[in-house]
């Protein structure tokens, strides 16, 4: 297949393909960090949303495209970075846009995927990526298929849990340091505030400062092929120096 991009020596695709969402101007966008380190804004959807818009195919001047059909797919897939090139598709929906024929001038195809079941949230991790894409394929008999992809982001909003217990834990070093901490609840939303208390029950060592970190833990694979990663998302200094009464 030819993935649409600028071709060298005239070997590029004979047309341009654009995938546009019908509510692109009003729909919220998510900021996504790519492997290159650059940040990109992509349309944000929620589970059970309708994904609709149009596909524009425009042949290059003087070109015409003979094809055996045009289709658009909505795909949800998981890619493990230690198994690159292999994708697990957990959602795959198809809409046929055109029957076999010829495209000699710009054609616009509307598409709609109603109330799509998108139960998993998009995720870009250290070792795994879960993504949703729209993929347009112009199938051809004697030449490579022409393929265009467009990413979108899925974030699901859950109801606030009826039961949200506090967290209490005790940690320390035997006969040297004994602390107890408490958080006001065990489940938080993305814009929540973490409120808690830390009690120093025993201090027999010198303390320079105390920090609170928010970490994201990621576990991929299974059994002996399990990969664990931890990433610090935020760090706060909550105490400078030793605790005093």
What are these regions (language model features)?
Residues 1-245:
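C-terminal beta-sandwich interaction modules and adjacent acidic
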């Amino acid at each position: 297949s030819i993935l649409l991009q600028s071709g060298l020596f005239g070997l590029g695709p004979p047309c341009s393909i654009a995938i546009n969402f019908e509510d692109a101007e009003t729909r919220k966008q998510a900021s996504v960090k790519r492997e290159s380190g650059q940040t990109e804004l992509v349309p944000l959807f929620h589970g059970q949303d309708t994904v609709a818009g149009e596909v524009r195919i425009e042949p290059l001047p003087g070109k015409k495209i003979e094809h055996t059909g045009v289709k658009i797919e909505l795909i949800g897939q998981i890619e493990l970075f230690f198994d690159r090139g292999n994708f697990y598709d957990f959602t795959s929906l198809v809409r046929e846009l055109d029957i076999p024929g010829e495209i000699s001038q710009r054609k616009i195809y509307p598409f709609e995927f109603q109330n799509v079941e998108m139960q998993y949230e998009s995720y870009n991790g250290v070792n795994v990526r879960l993504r949703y894409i729209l993929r347009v394929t112009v199938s051809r008999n004697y030449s490579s298929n022409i393929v265009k992809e467009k990413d979108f982001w899925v974030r699901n909003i859950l109801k606030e849990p009826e039961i949200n217990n506090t967290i209490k834990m005790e940690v320390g070093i035997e006969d040297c340091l004994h602390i107890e901490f408490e958080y006001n609840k065990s489940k938080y939303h993305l814009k929540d505030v973490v409120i808690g208390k830390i009690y120093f029950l025993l201090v027999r060592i010198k303390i320079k400062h105390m920090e609170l970190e928010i970490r994201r833990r990621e576990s991929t694979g299974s059994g002996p092929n399990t990969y664990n990663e931890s990433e610090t998302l935020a760090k706060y200094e909550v105490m400078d120096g030793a605790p005093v009464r």
